[in-house]
Amino acid sequence: MEEFKQRCLNQPYGDVGHLLRPLAYQKHPYQWPTIGKDLSHVANATLEEVKAFFFRFYAPNNAILAVTGNISFEEAVELTEKWFGSVPRREVPVRNLPQEPEQTEERRLTVERNVPLDSLFMAYHMCDHRHPDYYVFDILSDVLSNGRSSRLNQHLVQEKQLFSSIDAYISGSVDAGLFHIAGKPSAGVSLELAEAAVRDELDRLQQELVEDRKSVV
């Protein structure tokens, strides 16, 4: 509960994900943040419910172990067997989540809060993590916002000074995810003007080839 308050309620823009997810997903469970939609979902969870969830999904055959450092593969296997070998496998439900229908119209939400600066958050549906184009979107997000020479930073922050900061990134979801653009317009710049400038840059991205040197920054 304290983590929910700290991350989602007690800081500016902390609940952006809670507001954006239901806009983007109408059927898929991604509309639910992992931590819950509101504080009551955490507060009202019983110990029995938590234990049932744990023993339903937390099993060695439903986990990935990542090991880094100065260790050989053989040592990693030996230590894994030592510390986790006695944990029994369990029957885990087959992952069968509903597919999100194609979005055919724009959805938008305007929220007024006591925050330091206006902020613009845009999201577009993209392919899932297993699709070859996933890496294309990953590179496109870098072309748009990774480094001072990136398109959004160069054109909208440095040249036109429409934004004080702006970023583009992908959600990295296993199922179909989102391509995000988030930025804070400069003082005196309306959200409408800021949004129009971003859309212009996206149009330009479709019309102009990306230089080779920029695609590997």
PLM regions with names:
Residues 5, 22, 92-149:
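His/Glu-based metal-binding/catalytic segments typifying zinc-dependent metallopeptidases
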Residues 1-92, 110, 128, 136, ...:
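Charge-rich, well-structured scaffold segments of protease-associated domains
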Residues 153-154:
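Phosphate-proximal small/polar/acidic motifs at interfaces that engage nucleotide phosphates
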